């Protein structure tokens, strides 16, 4: 064989071997990267979590948050202090990585724990190749040397405590695969426990079903459950201009007596109630009621106050009355009185199948009230308008109004009247007269632009819906409302700028919540 031929063969072989070596190196590096990508962050989340926020693209999510109308008005989403800190330093951190954040690090998860406050949260993210070194460089550059961090051992793992400029302390659990941060060292310890003993949120079958991979992932997803209201429910999050949308699904089908399972027993209703609500209404609910027994039983379970035997007996009598006479829809509302400094007026409106018979039976019911129970106040008074006098009936003491509306009323007195084919109930006579007079004058909510805009995003057929103008609602210190989670009140400085619209629809046993937060521009 000629020398030239041997040289060609040697060069060709070297190139082939070099390419093969490079291919193998790339394959193993890709395999390692895929291994990191497959790390399940949910295996770190303690089972005590009440809500979880997750995004697979933190940069895109932050960009969408910055593009919201509220952000442009310097009203930033501060419901998570950890996220606020991350957002503050995210672009700085990105500058430290010339090729951008790794795919693993771009995924972020925050778990929320009871009692719900800005400190009882944990932030998690995966780490790709080189991310650990990136974080170390970032910490060395931006953490003050005047207050050096301290490291503690817990079950063989390092927890580093960093003092913050505002006096808080940030606990960090950092490995080559992931990072977990919290203002509570004890929460980081529970993260380590979940990671080591394998008892995490990932092992909860209800949560695992809700968090199953999706074909079309949203920019962010929230998983939440509320005791007595709903089990783990998935909400895809979308942000645009004046709106924050949460489109959800709840597969929970267990036998727990939750509000979601009560909805499954009801038929849907159609149409929005704006024409039958005062223009000053700032909160209302509307729902279908075809199974009164389950709805009344749920309300009875939610009531925490002490009831006398007389009140329990009256509750049963009025429950039977409603089951015999009420129709298939229920509307509850809060609205302003003429003196806006007074506590809000409250009215429950029920459709009635036969008004004449319902009124006759109501008169019979109040006639059974004993002289001692009646007291000196008359059982029947009148609400006078320009065209008519409406009889107003003072019912025996009952807690059904609170059970059906979710309003924590300070009194067990209830007043009733019939108006436009509906039974109206209220905790005081003034609420009834104010309601009737506003509607008689045509002063209804349907004319409000904010109301109509919110309805545009909702379905005309549903099982339950809610509207809450938080700015007005937060001024009602005496009103505790069952259907509005305390989370909104604890973050009132941000949410007071929003109106909440929520709708729950049931199809084939699956509940589909649809929540819209509309920003009220100045």
Segments (PLM) and residue ranges:
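Active-site proximal loops enriched in glycine and acidic residues that flank catalytic Cys/His/Asp
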Residues: 286-288, 334, 350-352, 426-428, ...
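Juxtamembrane low-complexity tails/linkers enriched in Ser/Thr-Pro and polybasic
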Residues: 1-2
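C-terminal regions of mature proteins
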Residues: 497-520
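Structural boundary/hinge residues at secondary-structure and domain interfaces
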Residues: 6-12, 16-161, 207-229, 247-345, ...
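Short, glycine-/Ser/Thr-/acidic-enriched flexible segments
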Residues: 186, 289-290, 353-355, 429-431
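Conserved aromatic
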Residues: 128-129, 182, 352, 426
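An internal, short helix-loop-strand segment that often contains or flanks glycine-aspartate motifs
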Residues: 72-106, 142-245, 249, 266-280, ...
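Composition- and surface-driven signal marking solvent-exposed, interaction-prone regions
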Residues: 193-195, 260-263, 297-299, 360-365, ...
């Amino acid at each position: 064989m000629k020398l030239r031929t041997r040289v060609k063969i040697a060069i060709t072989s070297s190139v082939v071997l070099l390419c093969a070596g490079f291919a193998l190196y790339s394959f193993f590096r890709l395999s390692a990267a895929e291994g990191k990508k497959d790390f399940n962050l949910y295996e770190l989340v303690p089972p005590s979590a009440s809500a979880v926020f997750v995004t697979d693209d933190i940069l895109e999510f932050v960009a969408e948050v910055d593009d919201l109308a509220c952000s442009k008005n310097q009203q930033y989403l501060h419901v998570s202090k950890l996220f606020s800190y991350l957002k503050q330093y995210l672009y700085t951190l990105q500058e430290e990585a010339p090729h951008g954040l790794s795919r693993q690090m771009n995924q972020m998860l925050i778990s929320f724990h009871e009692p719900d406050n800005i400190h009882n949260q944990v932030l998690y993210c995966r780490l790709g190749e080189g991310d650990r070194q990136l974080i170390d460089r970032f910490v060395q550059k931006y953490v003050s040397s005047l207050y050096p961090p301290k490291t503690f051992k817990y079950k063989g793992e390092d927890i580093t405590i960093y003092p913050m400029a505002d006096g808080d302390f940030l606990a960090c659990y950092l490995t080559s695969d992931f990072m977990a941060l919290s203002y509570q060292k004890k929460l980081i310890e529970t993260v380590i426990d979940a990671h080591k003993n394998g008892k995490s949120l990932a092992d909860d079958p209800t949560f695992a079903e809700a968090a199953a991979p999706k074909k079309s992932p949203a920019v962010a997803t929230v998983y939440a459950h509320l005791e007595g209201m709903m089990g783990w429910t998935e909400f895809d999050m979308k942000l645009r201009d004046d709106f924050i949308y949460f489109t959800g699904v709840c597969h929970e089908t267990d036998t727990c007596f939750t509000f979601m399972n009560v909805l499954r027993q009801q038929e849907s209703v159609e149409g929005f109630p704006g024409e039958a609500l005062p223009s000053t209404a700032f909160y209302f609910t509307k729902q279908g009621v075809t199974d009164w027994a389950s709805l009344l039983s749920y309300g009875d379970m939610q009531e925490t106050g002490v009831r006398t035997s007389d009140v329990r007996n009256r509750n049963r009598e009025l429950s039977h009355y409603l089951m015999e006479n009420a129709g298939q829809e229920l509307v509850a509302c809060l609205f302003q009185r003429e003196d806006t400094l007074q506590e809000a007026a409250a009215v429950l409106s029920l459709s009635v199948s036969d008004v004449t018979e319902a009124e006759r039976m109501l008169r019979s019911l109040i006639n059974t009230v004993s002289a001692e129970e009646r007291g000196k106040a008359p059982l029947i008074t009148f609400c006078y308008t320009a065209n008519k006098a409406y009889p107003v009936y003072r019912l025996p003491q009952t807690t059904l109004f609170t059970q059906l509306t979710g309003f924590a009323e300070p009194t067990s007195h209830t007043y009733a009247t019939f108006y436009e084919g509906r039974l109206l109930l209220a905790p005081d006579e003034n609420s009834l007269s104010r309601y009737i007079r506003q509607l008689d004058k045509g002063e209804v909510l349907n004319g409000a632009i904010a109301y109509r805009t919110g309805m545009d995003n909702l379905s005309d057929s549903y099982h339950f819906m809610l509207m809450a103008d938080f700015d007005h609602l937060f001024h009602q210190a005496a009103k505790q409302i069952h259907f509005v989670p305390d989370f909104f009140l604890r973050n009132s400085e941000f949410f007071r700028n929003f109106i909440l619209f929520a709708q729950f629809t049931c199809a084939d046993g699956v509940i589909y919540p649809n929540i819209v937060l509309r920003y009220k521009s100045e």
